[in-house]
Regions:
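Short glycine-/polar-rich loops that comprise or flank the Walker A/P-loop
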Residues: 2, 153-154, 182-185, 229-230, ...
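Conserved catalytic/switch belt of AAA+ P-loop NTPases
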Residues: 204-207, 216-275, 298
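Walker A/P-loop
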Residues: 156-189
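Conserved RecA-like P-loop NTPase ATPase core
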Residues: 44, 146, 199, 247, ...
Length: 398
């Protein structure tokens, strides 16, 4: 891998290709050994190639603006690593990975991907209708990372627990691109809601007549679109080997979809496949290595922003009382549940928060707030745990 990386860096124009190739390969090897084992992690040659390709683009861009020094080459390569890798790391692995970068590239500094005009458009779209969202720097960073991943790869996966904002990330990015003058068309489908033949199409063995499926029909539509129009085929649902393996040739450098009828559909650089799912346990390593990853963790969720947004929907007369009770009781109760982790039915942090808030909507007295909170947050606990939880909540409410 060192030799491959060295040759690739030389072709991209790096003068210190040998030294940088050793460092970047060491970083990938140590990351594979030291970071947690996650299904969506890929430390192979495809991921390395994506980093080197981004580094080459950044180098060309930097040389167009000023003279590039030896130290600046390392900084550009670190920036390429951050752009391609930080988006897929879990909350706990991120700090470990950044420490590895600091050890392998001592003294070199770098920053995340710069948003520029796109970031300005994202902020404007988030605050305007129909989104009306509270600005969240982590979420904005994920949107910029998704844009970079879509530019790098044909296929991208937005993976994370239910309610973490996966749909919001790509929908806001789409609106921001349109705001910036880029035409974007989207085809959304749930592959798990239909049989394979209805998704990918089938051939009648008697008449030899081909019938398009939902995905193949969308594929025909996007290849007809003008080159200046960005087209996204969004698959919202579980990534299943039954149909995803058929797209492997699309997701690699060939960009070809071969139908069972023998017909081939070739996609241009303006087409992307975007997969939105809660996990990748059924996807093969071959599929994962072909796609860019945007991982949204429960820890990235800002619970106070979520609660503040809900509070704005309440009556003005109750809002000040609710704000005080939320601060004094709700957050303590939520932290207590997170520490317990004894839910009867597995749920996410966002799901737990929304359950609790739904039960205290419209309350006007402290007693009704406490009773509603116990009902909402404690409804997913066993009888004994619910009793202990209720005692704690009543103690905080005194």
């Amino acid at each position: 891998n060192e030799l491959i990386a060295e040759v690739y860096l030389q072709t991209e124009g790096f003068t210190q290709a040998r030294g940088l190739s050793k460092k970047i390969v060491s970083l990938f090897m140590l990351s594979k050994q030291l970071l947690s084992r996650q299904r969506h992690y890929d430390w192979g040659l495809r991921a390395l190639k994506a980093v080197l390709n981004t580094g080459g683009k950044l180098l060309v861009q930097a040389r167009g603006e000023a003279q590039v020094s030896v130290g600046m080459e390392a900084e550009l390569l670190i920036k390429a690593v951050r752009i391609n890798t930080l988006s897929k790391l879990t909350f706990s692995d991120t700090s470990c990975f950044l420490a590895l970068i600091g050890d392998i590239f001592p003294g070199a500094e770098s920053s995340d991907v710069a948003g520029g005009e796109l970031e300005v458009a994202i902020r404007k779209v988030m605050q305007s209708k129909p989104f009306s969202l509270t600005l969240d720097e982590t979420q904005i960073c994920k949107m910029l990372q998704l844009k970079e991943a879509l530019d790098q790869r044909m296929g991208c996966v937005v993976v994370g627990p239910s309610g973490c904002g996966k749909s919001t990330v790509w929908r806001v990015l789409k609106a921001a691109l349109i705001e910036g003058g880029q035409a974007v068309q989207v085809h959304v489908m749930n592959p798990k809601s239909m049989p394979r033949q209805q998704l990918l199409g089938e051939m009648d063995m008697d008449t030899r007549e081909w019938t398009d499926g939902v995905l193949t029909d969308a594929a025909r539509n996007v290849v007809k679109a003008p080159a200046e129009v960005r087209s996204w085929i969004v698959c919202d649902g579980d990534v299943d080997p039954e149909w995803i393996e058929s797209l492997n040739s699309v997701l690699d450098d060939n960009h070809l979809l071969t139908l069972p009828s023998g017909e081939r559909i070739s996609f241009g650089g303006n087409v992307n496949f975007l997969f939105e799912t809660h996990d990748l346990r059924f996807a093969s390593p071959a599929t994962i290595s072909r796609m860019g990853m945007i991982f949204l963790a429960d820890e990235d969720t800002n619970k106070k922003r979520l609660v503040s947004k809900w509070l704005l929907s309440q009556d003005n007369a109750n809002r000040s009382h609710l704000a005080g009770w939320l601060e004094d009781i709700f957050y303590k109760a939520l932290d207590y549940l997170v520490r317990m982790r004894s839910f009867v039915v597995e749920t996410t942090l966002v799901g737990t928060i929304l359950n609790g808030l739904s039960s205290i909507s419209g309350v006007s007295t402290k007693l009704s707030f406490v009773v509603g909170l116990i009902r909402g947050l404690g409804g997913n606990l066993s009888a004994s745990d619910r009793s202990c939880f209720a005692k704690e909540v009543f103690a905080w409410a005194r």
